[in-house]
């Protein structure tokens, strides 16, 4: 192999196109395809935002008390086979055979003629009688066959009528059952309508109270680990965003420490899964349609955050109390950094009613540092 060809292959090896980053993961910190995504999910090493996956349990998705499934009963159809039994009677007719026996022509023709004629006449009369009997028997057999057929027809017609009656009764029973089911469904629908008319006020207010309590719990606890800048709680219906809680801190150091601590904790009987998130701006990650109208036509197919907000008074009180607590912490830290004489003068001035110039100057210095 030539050195030039080897160098060209090495150049081609290192000049491959870089992996394409997943825009949804970079912008929202979650992707519908997860690890199976064809694009690159670049996890940040340092970030001000952490993701608490599926921490919020949305009652509208998990509680089945307010949803009634319309069950469709399976109807079994029965098919009745009508079989008509036809009796075939085989009649055996009698066949008469007439044997003509030859007579010897002797010299006594005149004597035997009368006897023969009489015998022939008697035989003919007997044969005629036998044929008459045969005809009569044959006619009687035909009549019997016809009678049997007619009786079979009558029986078959009666069976068909009975089957028709049974079928009609079955259809009537099915129709009555269907009518009963329809009436029950109508009653259930009416009950659902009345329940829906009664439930929304309760469910909306109760769910908002529950969410406010949840928001307050996580805000108070996480604010002890670092100063919170913003929180976004997702109420999406898809799996990769449902219940996700995004917490943005004032500093990346606070986010890093909070991430380590939260991964060791439990909430509501379940372990907390925390991770650094690449989300830098919640406004870009939020669904504008859901934010403006609290509704999204894409529903579960939407890959942007459907953020649920707490009550305004609770949110304001939480952020105000956090700001106050961190201001007091900063004051304590500043007091530790002040020189000894200023600290002693500030302590004595707190006891005095009128105060002096040293105390005023120390407080002014603290306020300037805070600003």
Swiss-Prot record:
Q: What is this protein's function per UniProt? A: Transcription factor required for yeast cell adherence to silicone substrate.
Checking SMART domains in the record gives:
RRM_1, ZnF_C3H1
- Which stretches does the entry tag as region Disordered? 94-194, 337-371
Q: Where is the composition biased (Polar residues)?
A: 94-107, 355-371
Domain (RRM): residue spans on this chain:
192-279
Cite the entry's keywords alphabetically. Answer: Cell adhesion, Metal-binding, Nucleus, Repeat, Transcription, Transcription regulation, Zinc, Zinc-finger
GO BP of this protein = cell adhesion; mRNA splicing, via spliceosome; positive regulation of cell adhesion involved in single-species biofilm formation; positive regulation of cell-substrate adhesion; regulation of transcription by RNA polymerase II; single-species biofilm formation on inanimate substrate
Report the stretches of sequence that form zinc fingers (C3H1-type). Answer: 16-44, 281-309
Upregulating conditions: Expression is induced in biofilm.
Any one Gene Ontology MF annotation carried by this entry is:
pre-mRNA 3'-splice site binding
Q: Where is the composition biased (Acidic residues)?
A: 115-124
Q: Where is the composition biased (Basic and acidic residues)?
A: 132-194
Locations listed in the record: Nucleus
Q: Which GO terms describe its cellular component?
A: spliceosomal complex; U2AF complex
Cross-referenced SUPFAM superfamilies, in alphabetical order?
A: RNA-binding domain, RBD
Q: What is its main location?
A: nucleus
In its UniProt entry, what is this protein called? Answer: Transcriptional regulator of yeast form adherence 2
Name the phenotypic consequences of knocking out this gene.
Decreases cell adherence to silicone substrate.
